[in-house]
Regions:
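Interfacial segments of multi-pass membrane proteins
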Residues: 16-20, 33, 37, 52-81, ...
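Alpha-helical transmembrane segments and their immediate juxtamembrane flanks
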Residues: 105-129
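Alpha-helical transmembrane segments and immediately membrane-proximal extracytoplasmic
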Residues: 1-3, 18-27, 64, 97-110, ...
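Anion-binding (especially nucleotide phosphate/pyrophosphate-binding) glycine-rich loop
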Residues: 8-32
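Alpha-helical transmembrane segments of multi-pass membrane proteins
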Residues: 1, 34-38, 74-78, 115-122
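Interhelical loop and helix-boundary elements at the membrane-water interface
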Residues: 1-10, 40-53, 80-89, 122-149
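Membrane-helix boundary elements
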Residues: 28-46
Length: 149
């Protein structure tokens, strides 16, 4: 369930920042670890989700204002293109770039890019289906023409 995925990543960031407050970028490291743990859970033979909800939770805890912006961005891109994956893609590229610039830290951007690369990889088949015209759009799902897996 997405709300749990958002919450666990946000909690990881908050706890890490609280317990290890003197360690630079510990929140980002904990957030990325949470995203990777969601994508590759050992108890599910390393076959988990695609990681965006956890990524959003991480972003929410790192910078809640940015999280609000990306929520609107994902919604807008999805409405315009009919594909959630395109909003997801724009977001996972935008967050490291924005936070790296805002915090004046290439290291922060690189830490966040670890999750970006893995999320993009996990969505690779969505991109292939969009290219071939076989990806099911959100409007089709909402109209009941297709069921999401």
């Amino acid at each position: 369930m997405a709300i749990h995925d958002i919450g666990k990543a946000a909690l990881a960031v908050i706890l890490a920042r609280t317990v290890f407050s003197q360690v630079p970028y510990i929140g980002a490291v904990a957030g990325v670890a949470s995203v990777l743990g969601h994508i590759f859970p050992f108890y599910l033979k390393f076959k988990g989700g695609k990681g965006f909800a956890s990524y959003f939770g991480m972003t929410l805890a790192l910078n809640w204002k940015l999280a609000l912006v990306i929520a609107v961005l994902v919604f807008a891109v999805t409405l315009i293109t009919d594909y959630i994956v395109l909003g997801t893609t724009l977001t996972v590229f935008s967050v490291p770039a924005y936070l790296g610039i805002a915090e004046h830290s290439m290291l922060l951007a690189l830490i966040l890019c670890i999750a970006t690369v893995v999320i993009i990889y996990k969505h690779r088949m969505n991109y292939v289906r969009i290219y071939h015209g076989t990806e099911i759009g959100l409007r089709s799902v909402m109209k009941g023409k297709h069921r999401m897996k």
